[in-house]
């Protein structure tokens, strides 16, 4: 019978070969995409567990199906651990993604057509913070706030002035490409002054918040959302947190039955394991190393005149580099670096002049290489390899040298062994 096939290497060679090739790619490439990380084998194993068979619409103790005793145990563990990790009174661990977590938060806080302020996409915001191609920009009246054109960091006085002018119902704080500490208290003060609610999307910095290395938004935000991958180093999924009982009820209703049906309990199990890992003191050490590695790379780029680090610094796990003085655009840089086995993404920079398909910049994050074991010395080396590559795009001999140096690094810090 088909379901007796447990060796997919033999049963479905095409899928096996693609997955095996991806395993090799991850082992042999230096991963600098800021939204990616490396999960533990325990987290990976939970995602392939028997829980994938179980349907469980509803919430622990209030399911629409029978046979949910054990998934209730798993989901309750995930909820309690998430609450402990972030100091929240209420947590919903069911969102399939950060985008769905954000959609649920919007449904709980505002109505279609309401005015919302979110960070401009080119300044480091996210598609779900009001982009016209996203449900957020199509459902709500989003008005973008920006960074200061001189410093390229948030100017809270300017944000307050803009909020007083547009009178939003909601202000969204958080980013996908902003390299500095976000002052959530100031955002809450601004929201209170104009009678708005505050939502924080901490998807990128949640691991740093959990480790106490970035201010926690929970005391200030009406609702906080996050993904569970990125700096939390967990499975791909979402999480919604609040300290408000009424909002917690609205969030639960928004997620089920509003946006989703049955939760992915095998992913919820992986989230529970992730939160236990995050609560371990070793995780704080890891998170501190992420920041140290990021700052080590920034130092290298700041020492090279043709590479401009946006805002000149980083206080978290990522930073942007304007590469237009060395190559045509960010897409060109991304493709050339991919060819030498360094993986990152093109990215818009504040007040971007190029299209999102080309961009002036690249985004670099250190969560994945830190999980792999890289320290400041290795990260400085990687930064130098990026400079070397982009300054010698037509020199195949130099590019081959970079490939060999990348191999020395990836061989010295193996990722996984014999997973497939």
Curated annotation (Swiss-Prot):
Catalysis performed (reactions): (6R)-5,10-methylene-5,6,7,8-tetrahydrofolate + glycine + H2O = (6S)-5,6,7,8-tetrahydrofolate + L-serine
GO molecular function, one term: pyridoxal phosphate binding
The EC number(s) this enzyme carries: 2.1.2.1
Cofactor(s) needed: pyridoxal 5'-phosphate
Compartments where found: Cytoplasm
InterPro entries with a match to the protein in the record: PyrdxlP-dep_Trfase, PyrdxlP-dep_Trfase_major, PyrdxlP-dep_Trfase_small, Ser_HO-MeTrfase, Ser_HO-MeTrfase-like, Ser_HO-MeTrfase_PLP_BS, SHMT-like_dom
Alphabetized PANTHER family for the sequence: SERINE HYDROXYMETHYLTRANSFERASE, SERINE HYDROXYMETHYLTRANSFERASE 1
Protein name: Serine hydroxymethyltransferase
Organism: Streptococcus mutans serotype c (strain ATCC 700610 / UA159)
